[in-house]
Amino acid sequence: MAVSAGFKVSIEIVKKVLDLGRQYGVDVDGLLKEYDFRIQPIKGDPAYMPAEDVEFMLSVGLRQMSDPLPGLTLGVVSQQQLFGLVAFLAQTSSTVGACLEKIMQLEPLISNIGKTCLEYSPGEAQLIWHCHIQDPFVRTHVGSFILFTYTQLINTGTQAGHLVHEVHMAHPAPKDRATLDVYRNAFNCPVIFNARHYRVLFPATAVDLSVNTADPMLNTVLAEHAQKLLEERAKPASFTDEGRLHIQKLLQDGNVSRENVAAML
């Protein structure tokens, strides 16, 4: 069962994921050709593609990796770099709390297949990722990737060192001890499986810690730019954008002609 209609993923992020797969040795281009998979923008929303297409792509691609925990491994390899602007904003926020708030604000630039929120209980902060992916295999590895990225951000973002003291996974534990140890070694803390949500737990006081090399002025400029991007992407596609998309599709299909362009417009 795929994600429901209305969920989407940034095409820019999809391309970065494909490049990451190539770097890891996956025959990405061969798989794209074999399954006739194309990066097709959503009509009226040219910066994104349907999440169900991306879920299928991940289902195929992740299974090509010999690693039993491909999502976790890709998280280790990519660190925060995959998130581009979001990661850069995080690095320039003044505190851990401000950094996490900025990521939550900008999450829609990446996708709406998951939503991050920050909740508090006495003495503890919980960074929760609500996942809308239905395919159990894909959900397992995307969830592992997301939580590893958040854990690294919190643990390496300040002078305090290791802050995350527990991680919850909303999928079953691996059956063999060796794979379970990989999880625990990667997160360097207890990992709880079959939890209700994907969750990273750390001291509530950590949200007020200063972030390494924070630059509040640069953060303000970048935040304003990111907000403009969000506003622009929320607008309906213009006639020019629609025309560009149609022509790109014709180019991909090898059917470019004056008649075909006129017919699509």
Give a label for each model feature.
Residues 1-127:
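N-terminal low-complexity or simple alpha-helical regulatory segments
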Residues 9, 138, 142, 214, ...:
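Short, contiguous, pocket-lining structural segments
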Residues 20, 30-31, 153, 183, ...:
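Residues within well-ordered alpha helices
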Residues 29-30, 140-141, 259:
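Short, solvent-exposed positions on alpha-helices
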Residues 37, 81-204:
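N-terminal regulatory/effector-sensing and dimerization cores
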Residues 58, 147-150, 247:
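Hydrophobic alpha-helical core bundles mediating ligand binding, dimerization, or RNAP-core interactions
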Residues 182-265:
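Extended mid-to-C-terminal alpha-helical interaction segments
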